[in-house]
Amino acid sequence: MVSHKVLEFGDDGYKLPAQARAPRSLRKKRIYEKKIPGDDKMCAIDLLATVAGSLLLESKSPVNACLVVQNTVKNEYPADENPVKAVPYSESPSLFDNGKCGFSSVITNPNHLLVGDKVGKEVEGFSSLGVSGDVKPDVVASIGSNSSTEVGACGNGSPNESRDDVNLFSRNDDDENFSGYIRTRMTRPVPRIGDRRIRKILASRHWKGGSKNNTDAKPWYCSKRSYYLHHHQRSYPIKKRKYFDSVYDSNSDDYRLQGKTHKGSRTISSMKSRNASFVSRDHHVKLRIKSFRVPELFVEIPETATVGSLKRMVMEAVTTILGDGLRVGLMVQGKKVRDDGKTLLQTGISEENNHLDSLGFSLEPSLETTPQPLLSSYLSDHACDDVTLCHDNALDSSHEPEPSPADSFGKLGTSDHSRALIPVASAAMLAPRPPNRKFKRTEQQLAAQRRIRRPFSVTEVEALVQAVEKLGTGRWRDVKVRAFEDADHRTYVDLKDKWKTLVHTARISPQQRRGEPVPQELLDRVLKAHAYWSQHLMHQLQTEPPSTQVEAL
């Protein structure tokens, strides 16, 4: 069951209207000030400052000046039709707000009297009326055009201020037809006349203003921007209010500057935003190169040679490799940078990068210095129209060492069965070289050359299949001696791997094959030879004794 409670204030039993509550996060973070014992007592210096301020305002504006407005009081209750009077500000600090002269009104029941305009009578009236500080009559009154009301004229006349928990309001668009006040709280709190209350009043600009007219005194939120920030931050928790305060402090100067210089402030603010978003990249990268990587050198010298001859030979080898041009190579984190048009920042080299030790430099011979027209002139001098390749001698030429450019050109030009194509390797060999360069092919260079991956040609595959058909799959050294004796770049391990690749290629579909195409006739021969020698090996293992099988394994 739900219990309905009726709140009665006064004699009429008026119900408290529903009010919107603040968010739960805001209610949790609300800070309640502890009541300091003795805080209600006013200090002597604070009381003196309050009295001095009130006297200053009273001397500037007549206290007894009253403005009579021909209006009518329309009460919400039809039985109560009593006029309402507003008395001037009195010097009693316990009944009204301290430090300001404003409106003060008392709304009573029909059996009560109104307050007089003298200070003594006012105090007596309040004591005789017996209005308690905890309960007030709940009255909402609007001032119409049928009653006369006396309104005090002291103070700045601000319509939006509140006195004694009564919010006075008015409409600027229709002042003659409507004005009034609204009660928001039913209980009067204990008046705060201690240090904190007085300090807030003394810190306002009303006390610091030096103008003689009260209308010149403007509140601190006269600016639209600061007024918006002041009222907008009330709906946020206390932690977030610090952000609004910092925004107001940082933007106040810019806003005042914008009010004085209209176009200039826009330029300055735009320059500020650009400078905030733009970060200069004029930083320099500092590198320290300890040593260069030189191409590998192979020097062969007898033991009886002198140190000077060794130095001269090394110098000749360096001159031979580098030649007449040098080139610096750059490697970043193990990857060679080939594009010279990239910036250091795009490559990953910057001042903020802590991996500068991963940079590598190397001295390389500048092969690009060789002009391309020399190749065409070399070919035109020998009157060569078609450079051909011989199919019959392809295997024999691969067995021989690398010939000189002139010999290779002569052999290529005297072939009957030819193709009008120039391989890339042949074009590199045909390039002219300096006459003073010495070529010494050592065993180390030949061993390094053998490790270069060179795919098998169709002729080599045919020779391999023919040798395996005669010798079998378990005698790869004999296959090497029989078919590839002069091919130094082909080892018996290469032949064994190639045979396994051929068997796998022959078993898969043509759509799945990769690399250089092999005729289907050769692939069929590979399958037949592989099946024959596999059965022969199994039959041999079954007929031989176990001791022989162990020795064979």
Swiss-Prot record:
Claim: Disulfide bond is one of the keywords in the record: no
Record's keyword terms, sorted: DNA-binding, Nucleus, Transcription, Transcription regulation
InterPro entries the UniProt entry points to: Homeodomain-like_sf (IPR009057), Myb_dom (IPR017930), SANT/Myb (IPR001005), TRP_plant (IPR031105), Ubiquitin-like_dom (IPR000626), Ubiquitin-like_domsf (IPR029071)
Region feature Disordered, mapped onto this chain: 147-170, 394-413
A Pfam family the protein falls into: Ubiquitin_TPR1
Covalent S-S links between cysteines: none
Expression by tissue: Expressed ubiquitously. Highest expression in flowers and leaves.
Domain (HTH myb-type) ranges: 448-507
GO molecular function: DNA binding, bending; telomeric DNA binding
Cellular component terms (Gene Ontology): nucleus
Subunit structure: Homodimer and heterodimer with TRP1. Interacts with SNL1.
Function: Binds specifically to the plant telomeric double-stranded DNA sequences. At least 2 repeats of telomeric sequences are required for binding. Induces DNA bending.
Name this protein carries in UniProt: Telomere repeat-binding protein 2
